[in-house]
Structures are given as C-alpha cells and as structure tokens.
C-alpha cells in the first residue's frame, strides 16, 4: 500500500488529512497516512503556550501565539469552503474573532472528520532522505515521551510544518548590553509586560502592526517603529513614532539611520521568520525568503527535483486556511493518480510563468489578485468546492482600506460571508475595549460571561 508521511498537524497538515478523509468518504481507496506532530495536540501555531525557548522535552518551541491575539484579517476570507463558521457555531459570529475562537473552528472540522487516528503526537521528525533506487523516503523520528528514535519508509512526504516558528533575529550594535528587555515576536506572550513602557518595535509587517497595536491597547506609554524598507503608513495614535532603520543602541538610546534618537525601555524584534527545515536532506530542502511564489515548487506545492516531496503553505499568504485546502486537495489527487504531473520541462515552464508574474507585482492589491489567480488555477482540478474568489479578493482590498481608515478600529467592521451570504453581526464590545479574549467572553456579552 502507498504510504504518505505528513509532517505537522497544524492547519496545512490537517488540510491534507481532511482532503484524504473526504476522498475516502466518497468511496476512494486512500493510502496509509501517518502524521507526525511535535506538540502534544494538533492545531500548530494556533495552540497557545506560555513557554518560550524550549519545550518540556528541550525541543524548540513551535508556537508564536500570544495572549489577547485577535484575527487581523476578516474571518470571511479564510473560511473553509466545506465547513462554514455558521455550521460550526450554529449562527453568524463577528468578523474578527480572537485566537481561541478560530482555534475552536479549525478543530471543529477535523474532529468531525475523525482524522485524529492518523496523528502520532509528541513525535518530532529528525531526518528525511530519499533513496533513488527504491524510490522511497526514509523518515527518522523521535518519540519524545518514550525518548526513542525509529525510522519508517514512505512513498510520499508532505511537509506541512509551516514557516512561522524559526525567528529571523538580526544583530544591532549595542543590543547585547541594552539594559532593558529584548525579544523577538516569536517569544512575545503578553502585552501587559509593557504597560507604562517606551517600546521600540523593529519591523514593518503584520506582526509589528498587530503587536504594537495590542501593546498600545493594554497601556504601553509610547511605541516607536523602526522600518528597513517601507514604513507602516497608518494613522497611528499620538504616542506612536515611525523611524527608519535602527543603526545602534547606546544604553537605552536607540539611534536611527536618519540621525534621530529615542529613549526606549524594551526592544521587540518583529523581523520575520526563516523557512527552516533542518530535518530534510540538502537536496530536498526548500530555501526561500517569504514570498508569494517560492522557487522550485511546481504549483507552489511539488518539489521540482522530486515531486514526491510536497510542501504545503510555504507562500506568503493573503488566503490562508482555504488556500491550504486547495493545495492539499491538489496534492491528494496527484497521489491518488487523478492528476498526472507533467514532465520536468513543462513543470519548470509553469514555475517560471508564475515567478515572472510575481516579479511584476507592485502593490498589495497586485499581490491579492496574484494569489486569487493562483487559487483559481488549483481548485477546478479537484472536487474542492469552488467559491467566489473575486468576492474574497474584493474583501481583502476592503480590509486593506479599512486599516488605512482606522488602524485601531478596523476590527469593529462586519462583512458578508462568501460561503453563506449572511452578514456577520457586530461584536458586543469595541476591539479597543475588549480586554478579555476568551472564548466565553467573545460568545457572550460581558455580564453574561461573568456569571
């Protein structure tokens, strides 16, 4: 029997399990599936942990989630085509839920699908290589609870371990003797740590935007952004300052490229993450920066040099959960023989075509349109339910404009579900005033949650 190893039981790995389960439910013979998950439960990054650095087994902590995290994009853009929020919760819910609510939604679909039996928890992958003679992968893993190494062979390997768990940590002169707190966003857990503090946030992408907003919400005294390539051009509150690149630190004084200075109590590095796959042999390892179309992946999924190796969710993302689904359904159908991959030359031509389109992108709207077309390329080849991609793209653009109008208030907006046609109700509490991010507090008005 064909054997498939899936590395990681986060959103991408769970999408792959769900794709096979869906085919099996319709009568298809599916391969033997083994999903290796380092954590003790599934959910990937959406699992919150208080731990930073290493876990209880001495393994690098995977999670980058923090307390009080709310979705920074409309839930309507990430909704599963085969499992709506309304189906899960029994009614429409607001457009910007907190982490616990999104986690519950993700878990709802896979629990209903009965795919937990395929997952080996607390099992970390140590090494994967490929034998050209047998055409099999050898996957060596460690059972963390038993402290035992073992190896198994597989016909296909699906790498679904994500690329937001290994921090990119630049060095700035003087940072090693800075007298305050220095941390990467990967280790950020609680905005209350910075109440009354002057915070320097290095970076200008989504994590910088979100963590800075949260620290302001919970009482930081001031926030200074330092950007390398482009600033976060929003209408920030008065206590925010935007500076060019940090050049050095002397004591508590931060020095910037334009010669200006700021006195800060803490430095938060929102400097991104690395695509890091130390468990893969060099000839199998994806090496890329965070971009919309990584080199070497046919359809953004199949390793060009060996298409029996599959990568899910390795792109920079506008679409998330439903894009992982589109990729997983496509990968499934290749494994099942429903889709025949073309020869290497044709695959490379397709990669070059998409990379050429990516090189021409100039704006966020261009990126949204690019990924929309990517989705349109994948979904019709499978039985994943098609949905109105143009409406999702329009909603992404509306979201971008909403942030420009009110970076602190955009989460109070409501949108129409592309999957059901129903509009989300407003949340009972404005985001700036919603200090409790628990599942119960979100689902119930404050007085009800307190009872």
From Swiss-Prot:
Q: Under which EC number(s) is this enzyme classified?
A: 1.14.13.148
| Residues the record lists as binding NADP(+) | 70, 72, 204-205, 207, 228, 411
Q: Where does FAD bind?
A: 12, 37, 39, 45-46, 62, 72, 125, 317, 320
Highest taxon in the source lineage: Bacteria
Task: Name the family the entry cites.
Answer: Belongs to the FMO family.
| Induction conditions | Expression is induced by TMA.
Explain the purpose of this protein.
Answer: Catalyzes the oxidation of trimethylamine (TMA) to produce trimethylamine N-oxide (TMAO). In vitro, has a broad substrate specificity, oxidizing many nitrogen- and sulfur-containing compounds, including dimethylamine (DMA), dimethylsulfide (DMS), dimethylsulfoxide (DMSO), cysteamine, methimazole and dimethylaniline.
Q: What happens when the gene is disrupted?
A: Mutant cannot grow on TMA as a sole source of carbon and energy.
* Name this protein carries in UniProt: Trimethylamine monooxygenase
Which keywords has UniProt assigned to this entry? FAD, Flavoprotein, Monooxygenase, NADP, Oxidoreductase
Its ancestry begins with: Bacteria, Pseudomonadati, Pseudomonadota, Alphaproteobacteria, Hyphomicrobiales
Transmembrane residue ranges: none
Instruction: Give me the gene this protein comes from.
Output: tmm
Quickly give the catalysed reaction. trimethylamine + NADPH + O2 = trimethylamine N-oxide + NADP(+) + H2O
Any idea which GO molecular function terms this record carries? flavin adenine dinucleotide binding; N,N-dimethylaniline monooxygenase activity; NADP binding; trimethylamine monooxygenase activity
Organism whose genome encodes this protein: Methylocella silvestris (strain DSM 15510 / CIP 108128 / LMG 27833 / NCIMB 13906 / BL2)
| Cofactors that this protein relies on | FAD
Checking InterPro entries in the record gives: FAD/NAD-bd_sf (IPR036188), Flavin_mOase (IPR000960), Flavin_mOase-like (IPR020946), FMO-like (IPR050346)
